From Swiss-Prot:
Localization per record: Cytoplasm
UniProt key word Amino-acid biosynthesis: yes
Pathway given in the UniProt record: Amino-acid biosynthesis; L-lysine biosynthesis via DAP pathway; LL-2,6-diaminopimelate from (S)-tetrahydrodipicolinate (succinylase route): step 1/3
Subunit organization: Homotrimer.
Catalytic activity, as annotated: (S)-2,3,4,5-tetrahydrodipicolinate + succinyl-CoA + H2O = (S)-2-succinylamino-6-oxoheptanedioate + CoA
Claim: Amino-acid biosynthesis is one of the keywords in the record: yes
Species assigned in the record: Mesorhizobium japonicum (strain LMG 29417 / CECT 9101 / MAFF 303099) (Mesorhizobium loti (strain MAFF 303099))
Residue numbers binding substrate: 111, 148
Example of a GO cellular component annotation carried by this entry: cytoplasm
Database matches in InterPro entries: DapD_Trfase_Hexpep_rpt_fam, Hexapep, Hexapep_transf_CS, THP_succinylTrfase_dom1, THP_succinylTrfase_N_sf, Trimer_LpxA-like_sf
Protein name: 2,3,4,5-tetrahydropyridine-2,6-dicarboxylate N-succinyltransferase
Pfam families: Hexapep_2, THDPS_N_2
Cross-referenced NCBIfam families: dapD (TIGR00965), PRK11830.1 (NF008808)
Protein family according to the UniProt entry: Belongs to the transferase hexapeptide repeat family.
Length: 284
């Protein structure tokens, strides 16, 4: 799609969002067509909710996020097929795989294990592997990434190349509660089991999060070597584990409760990389 077409879509969707109270399942014409076109572009990976710029900053295409939100007003509840034992669900968003044949999967080039769920408008790149997991609307999962068992990729989240999201990992979405920007995991990161990254935080390229690390916008991320404190962003090539900071003392001067923090214990080295590198045998 040419840039003028995208500009036209953006203009239509911005106008529709300003008048969102008037949008319903009965809405037809230019508004419905524009929202559906935006979702189709997201689904194919032609556009994405956020894009990394040459200077390393991420640009958020807010109009695409708005298109995802508006689609919930347009679509009626309906039967969603594909449950275990021919069970069904009741929802507004169909599966990305609805109507797919073997030819469609071969063309898409990723592997989707039984019980993996991907909602329409999410993009999964060739070479990715989806274990029984959940990928929500508007998300982007890049090539070579594994989304391991019971991991979830939230709405509009951006997952880079050759990332490993371990079992039970949660990557937060943007739709509820509303966030200005999506949660982002950059290329070549390893996110340890049961960790959570939410609220539009960014884990920069090559970083490793140990098991059970929780990072939101208010989480202190402490560099053990320098004492520097980061918020909302893990620096590149960081090895991060769960930790705590001493709390304020009580009025009687007894120690108060410690507070959770994430601790950068070192930068990624060859030893760390050997323990967290992806296995190409699983991506053939």
């Amino acid at each position: 799609m040419s840039k003028p077409d995208l500009a036209s879509l953006e203009k239509t969707i911005e106008k529709a969002f300003d008048e969102r109270d008037a949008i319903s399942t009965a809405t037809r014409g230019e508004t419905r067509d524009a929202i559906q076109a935006a979702l189709d572009l997201l689904d194919r990976g032609t556009v994405r909710v956020a894009e990394r710029q040459a200077d390393g900053k991420w640009h958020v295409n807010q109009w695409l996020k708005k298109a995802v939100l508006l689609s919930f007003r347009l679509n009626p509840m309906e039967i969603i097929k594909g449950g275990p034992g021919q069970a069904v669900w009741w929802d507004k968003v169909p599966s990305k795989f609805d109507g797919w044949s073997a030819v469609d999967f071969e063309k898409a080039g990723f592997r989707a294990v039984p019980s993996s769920i991907v909602r329409r408008s999410a993009y999964v790149a060739p070479g990715a592997v989806l274990m029984p997991s959940f990928v929500n609307v508007g998300a982007y999962v890049d090539t070579g990434t594994m989304v391991d068992t019971w991991a979830s990729v939230g709405s509009c989240a951006q997952i880079g190349k050759n990332v490993h999201l371990s079992g039970g990992v949660g990557i937060g979405g943007v739709l509820e509660p509303m966030q200005a920007g999506p949660t982002i995991i950059e290329d070549n990161c390893f996110i340890g089991a049961r960790s959570e990254v939410v609220e539009g935080c960014i884990v920069r390229e090559g970083s490793v999060l140990g098991m059970g690390v929780f990072i939101g916008q208010s989480t202190k991320i402490v560099d053990r070597a320098t004492g520097e404190i980061f918020y909302g962003e893990v620096p590149p090539n960081s090895v991060v584990v769960a930790g705590s900071l001493p709390g304020k003392p009580f009025p009687n001067n007894e120690p108060g409760p410690g507070l959770y923090c994430a601790v950068i214990v070192k930068r990624v080295d060859a030893k760390t990389r050997s323990k967290t590198s992806i296995n190409e045998l699983l991506r053939d």
